[in-house]
Regions:
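Subset of outer-membrane beta-barrel
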Residues: 21-387
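Sec-dependent N-terminal signal peptides
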Residues: 4-14
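Positively charged n-region of N-terminal signal peptides that target proteins for export
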Residues: 1-4, 151
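Boundary at the C-terminal end of the N-terminal hydrophobic targeting segment
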Residues: 16-20
């Protein structure tokens, strides 16, 4: 197998750590795809609540979670800088940087965009007769337009260019890979009465990365990009004029087909032919629909492909925030299970947020992962300059 594919598989192994005993886990069958960095939560606020964001209050980093939320933002514009030192339990030079921003057009629409850069640090290799150092990385650039159709409902559409250079060598048959994708999102936000309290209900949906397959060595080895469907709900409960709580939950499913499992009595050549017909030769759009019914374990395994996240946020005086959450993934699909905590501080001009991962498994490389977000409110900056 070519070194590039080995690099991709190595990255997946870093991300999908299985911590279950063999007696408890009889089948490990994760959904395989390229560009793993596209699935990493980029910002500290959502990461501090267990990786939720489809229906939370709109913020500057909504581009990743649900761009349809932007028309509901209070500020006219904003920009955020996000940084995550990734897998620090294993290596010290893998990092994710993410920049997002938006601008509201009038009262009912907004444009937004983001830049994601995932660095795998330096990799030393003795390919051929010479030693060399390569710096593999992945990146993406996207833009979206969101429109409020009513006072409570909005939609959004986005486009994305994805670029991946995971080469260990620079031979003629190797090349960086790229793909194009689109997003479709919806958001509902309304007030509901619970007793004598006027609470805020949010519902969201985001279908992300609907697009082409990505190929490093030609169409014969093309891989799926991580298309996914995210559904979320949130409820903000005011306590008094200065205090409020928000509880929220997300369900996320990869819209990528599952690699067929080799059957008893099936030869290796027969199995490879079936994998090619039922998986490798499947187009990206067909693969989205196929992903709902192709799990070898049937409906039970399809349910296991859904990742669940729950979170809560406490806000005091719109300035101080405390957050907590939990993220769950089935053992057979990757076993990413962890608690998260976080906090934030906000002023008129800027806000600073931090998120922290606490793994339920002792040897999970995601344990103790930190995320940092520095966001700027353009209305606040404008008011400051007028003084």
């Amino acid at each position: 197998m070519k070194k590039l594919i080995l690099m991709s598989l190595f990255l997946q192994c870093l991300y999908l750590q299985v911590q279950a005993d063999d007696d408890k886990l009889t089948t490990f069958n994760p959904v395989e795809h390229a560009v793993i960095s596209e699935t990493i939560a980029p910002d500290a606020r959502s990461a501090g609540m267990g990786d939720v964001g489809a229906a939370t209050d709109p913020d500057v980093n909504s581009q990743y979670w649900n761009p349809a939320k932007y028309p509901f933002c209070i500020s006219r514009a904003g920009i955020a800088l996000n940084y995550t030192p990734w897998l620090r339990q294993l290596v010290n030079d893998i990092d994710l940087a993410y920049v997002a921003g938006y601008y509201r057009i009038g009262d009912y629409s907004a444009i937004s965009g983001s830049l994601r850069y995932f660095s795998l640090g330096e990799v030393y290799t003795d390919y051929g007769n010479s030693d060399m150092t390569v710096k593999p990385y992945e990146m993406s650039i996207d833009a979206a337009y969101s429109l409020m159709l009513s006072e409570t409902f909005s939609i959004a559409a986005g486009i994305r260019w994805i670029y991946s250079d995971l080469r260990f060598d620079y031979s003629e048959d190797s090349k960086p890979a790229s793909a194009f994708a689109a997003d479709l999102a919806m958001y509902y936000n309304n007030y509901v009465m619970m007793g004598n309290r006027e609470c805020q209900l949010g519902l969201g949906m985001n279908i992300r990365n609907i697009g082409s397959k990505i190929s490093f060595y030609g169409d014969e080895e093309s891989q799926f990009i991580p298309a996914n469907l995210r559904l979320g709900a949130s409820l903000m409960i005011p306590v008094d004029e200065y205090n409020r709580f928000t509880i929220t939950a997300d369900a996320n499913k990869l819209l990528v087909p599952t690699v067929p499992r080799q059957q008893e009595g099936e030869s290796n050549s027969e199995y490879q032919d079936r994998v090619r017909k039922e998986y490798s030769d499947v187009g990206s759009i067909k693969g989205i629909f196929q992903s709902f019914s192709d799990a070898p374990g049937g409906f039970k395994e399809e349910l296991e492909e859904i990742q669940w996240s729950v979170g809560a946020e406490y806000v005091y005086h719109d300035q101080f925030s405390l957050r907590a959450g939990y993220h769950h993934q089935a053992e057979s699909k990757g076993n990413l299970k962890y608690f998260t905590v976080g906090g934030g501080f906000r002023m008129n001009v800027f806000s600073l947020d931090v998120g922290y991962v606490i793994s339920t498994a002792r040897s999970n490389p995601l344990d103790q992962t930190l995320r940092f977000t520095l966001a700027f409110d353009m209305d606040g900056i404008k008011d400051l300059l007028k003084r």
